[in-house]
Amino acid sequence: MKITRHQERVWALQILYSLDISSELNIQKARKTCREFKYKKVLDKKRYYFEDIVEGVINSRQDLDSIINKYAIDWDVERMACIDRNILRIALYEIESGLPVGVAIDEAVEIAKDFGDSNSPKFINGILAKSIED
């Protein structure tokens, strides 16, 4: 089974969402959750991209949230929909890690269409677009 980067981003979002709503965004819980996730998906033991995203977002969360707060006018990251804030964190982490900006934004918007509410794609696109202008 070929696993796409898009699928791995979705898996990362699902894991980050579950950790975020349970207030367990810490690296130990993330690693345990990734191991359990791989077992449930019957994936082999190699390291997957979604694990890099999950760990990277958790390790960089304060910096990522500062960026989000800077560009989300009149919104605090903690008051945003959990899905939206984690899509933004993933996209910003990937941009910081060298993924082309256009790819990161396109992926974030597509994932927002599938998992967010009707306003999520526009909201996410706007914040990401503002953040790269600087």
UniProtKB/Swiss-Prot annotation:
GO terms for biological process: DNA-templated transcription termination; transcription antitermination. It holds the Pfam family NusB. InterPro entries: NusB-like_sf, NusB_fam, NusB_RsmB_TIM44. GO terms for molecular function: RNA binding. It comes from the Bacteria. The keyword RNA-binding applies. Keywords: RNA-binding, Transcription, Transcription antitermination, Transcription regulation. HAMAP family: NusB (MF_00073). Belongs to the NusB family. Involved in transcription antitermination. Required for transcription of ribosomal RNA (rRNA) genes. Binds specifically to the boxA antiterminator sequence of the ribosomal RNA (rrn) operons. This is Transcription antitermination protein NusB. It comes from Halothermothrix orenii (strain H 168 / OCM 544 / DSM 9562). The lineage of its organism: Bacteria, Bacillati, Bacillota, Clostridia, Halanaerobiales.
